[in-house]
């Protein structure tokens, strides 16, 4: 019975109904969750900063997109029909929603966001990843959003060679794996028996376009990829690739 009471209370916590909506006979009082130690609490200040949004959790980036020395915010949602948003830092601790002004209106979904200056123009660009967990229904194009340096972004996905294949993914990582001075991109895709979705290694061609060289590099990783990251673990100045797969 104690386990059932615990789960019932947790259920009400997840839907915001604890403790008021829990039947009195089954209520575990808030005092039971108190600690002997004084633990500081975080207050939700988002409403006061202009960034109070409610949606299915997606990706988030805090970076200086306009090079003014202040961190701006970009957020997305797992909802395929949900609008991603761009919040510009007002330099006073608050933010203004500049989604429409930035040219991002109509860009939907995105379970994850990964930023990088892929074209070496000193402005941070954004990669939007889509389709994860949706299997055959998750073959949505990702979006590479080029920062134009004037407060706007342009979707250049197909122009730069990233839009030829659409696989479900939620993970990618940037690094200059060939040490030629520009960033390359590894995208980890979700391979299943019903949907063959090899991971992709996009080599930067030094002209703002990319070529998928995963087959030649031996990194197609025909598995259900959940996370990828570059790092030079052996200090040879060449980035190495770590891939995490579901159930393997």
Protein language model features and the residues they cover:
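Acidic, glycine/proline-rich Ca2+-coordinating loop motifs
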Residues: 1-248
